[in-house]
């Protein structure tokens, strides 16, 4: 399934229906009064966050969204039918951004949030509303109001437990494929992954949501390569799983390159908890692996794990799950736009 994480939309709420000018035309009623009905209200456009969605694929061929307009009023004091509302479902983690001001209108950070983005126009008044003691046969009415219209940008920042980061060809996709139900492309060449992939790994009686971020290279924060477009997804991950190809000539340099790009993009990213893994350890001799592992561990003063291509992933997944449980016990302040 294609992963779409940014779309531009034109939104147009429905216009209100016009009021009606009408008079009673009944037998034996010589001076029938006004009976023109009001116009119907225009339809609204509403966004709703849906936990079952993980991409903006629904908007690939739907860039113009228009709600139904209200019908005009009719005789015998009949009001026009209201326009049909449009409900747009988006994944949790979607931001609605005003295209002109580039300001965030709303951040859908939890499921089942609703937001009225475009208000339908009010219906016009029929001539019945203008009847008075001095004007018993008014021919005045009002037109329906126009519905709101605006251009917005939807940006999806994937909400996941673990983000797999690393240089191109570090084995990220292979890891995700082996530990989850994700259908990712795996190849022995850089940039096999050109879009994020989500997977769910089962760990004992728990589930861990993992996202594979496309390979990030030097100057990714400036838009070089593929990384800049997808670095935003790292922001929503609780823990980073940093995979480093053990066959790299300098594992310290590979580590620093990745960390520098994260910090230059957003300094808060390097504050996230990180598990470091030297991957593809079956491709080197044990002596070489031991040397590189100690070199990196001593440089960082952190624990460094090793992983072979065919090795059991459960120990690493259990470690991730334990850290997630510890992190969930901490109170985290989440912005709630509906809280007063």
Curated annotation (Swiss-Prot):
Q: What class of enzyme is it?
A: hydrolase
Instruction: Report the InterPro entries cross-referenced here.
Output: G_OBG (IPR031167), GTP-bd (IPR006073), GTP-bd_Obg/CgtA (IPR014100), GTP1_OBG_dom (IPR006169), GTP1_OBG_dom_sf (IPR036726), OBG_GTPase (IPR045086), P-loop_NTPase (IPR027417)
Keyword annotations of the record: Cytoplasm, GTP-binding, Hydrolase, Magnesium, Metal-binding, Nucleotide-binding
- PROSITE patterns, per this entry? G_OBG (PS51710), OBG (PS51883)
**Which EC number(s) does the record attach to this protein?**
3.6.5.-
Give GO terms: molecular function aspect only. Answer: GTP binding; GTPase activity; magnesium ion binding
Q: What domain of life is recorded for the organism?
A: Bacteria
A cellular component annotation (GO) from this entry: cytoplasm
Residues the entry annotates as binding GTP: 166-173, 191-195, 212-215, 279-282, 310-312
**Location in the cell:** Cytoplasm
> Where along this sequence does the record place binding of Mg(2+)?
173, 193
Q: Which cofactor does it need?
A: Mg(2+)
Q: How does it assemble?
A: Monomer.
Which family, according to UniProt?
Belongs to the TRAFAC class OBG-HflX-like GTPase superfamily. OBG GTPase family.
The record's function comment reads: An essential GTPase which binds GTP, GDP and possibly (p)ppGpp with moderate affinity, with high nucleotide exchange rates and a fairly low GTP hydrolysis rate. Plays a role in control of the cell cycle, stress response, ribosome biogenesis and in those bacteria that undergo differentiation, in morphogenesis control.
What is the protein name for this chain?
Answer: GTPase Obg
Per the record, the gene is obg
């Amino acid at each position: 399934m294609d992963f779409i994480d940014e779309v531009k939309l034109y939104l147009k709420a429905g216009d209100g229906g016009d009021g009606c000018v009408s008079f009673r035309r009944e037998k034996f009623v010589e001076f029938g009064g006004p009976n023109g009905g009001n116009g119907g209200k225009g339809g609204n456009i509403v966004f709703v966050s849906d936990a079952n969605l993980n991409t903006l694929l629904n908007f690939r061929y739907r860039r113009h969204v228009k709600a139904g307009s209200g019908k005009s009023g009719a005789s015998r004091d009949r009001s026009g039918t209201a326009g049909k509302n449009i409900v747009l479902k988006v994944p949790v983690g979607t931001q609605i951004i005003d295209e002109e001001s580039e300001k965030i209108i709303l951040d859908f950070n939890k499921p089942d949030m609703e937001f009225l983005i475009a208000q339908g126009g009010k219906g016009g008044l029929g001539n019945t509303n203008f009847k008075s003691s001095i004007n018993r046969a008014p021919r005045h009415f009002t037109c329906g109001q126009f519905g709101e219209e605006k251009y917005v940008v939807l940006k999806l920042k994937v909400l996941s437990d673990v983000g797999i980061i690393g240089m191109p060809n570090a084995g990220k996709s292979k890891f995700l494929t082996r530990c989850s139900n994700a259908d990712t492309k795996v190849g022995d060449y850089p940039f096999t992954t050109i879009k994020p992939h989500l997977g769910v790994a089962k760990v004992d009686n728990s589930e861990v949501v993992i996202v594979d971020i496309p390979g990030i290279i030097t100057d990714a924060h400036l838009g070089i390569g593929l990384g800049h477009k997808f670095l935003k997804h790292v922001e929503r991950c609780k823990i980073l799983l940093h995979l480093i190809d053990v066959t790299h000539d300098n594992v310290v340099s590979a580590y620093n390159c990745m960390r520098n790009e994260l910090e230059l993009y957003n300094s808060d990213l390097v504050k996230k908890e990180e598990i470091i893994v030297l991957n593809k350890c079956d491709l080197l001799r044990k002596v070489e692996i031991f040397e590189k592992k100690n070199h990196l561990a001593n440089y960082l003063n952190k624990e460094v794990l090793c992983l072979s291509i065919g090795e059991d992933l459960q120990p690493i997944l259990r470690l991730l799950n334990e850290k997630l449980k510890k992190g969930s016990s901490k109170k985290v302040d989440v912005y709630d736009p509906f809280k007063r």
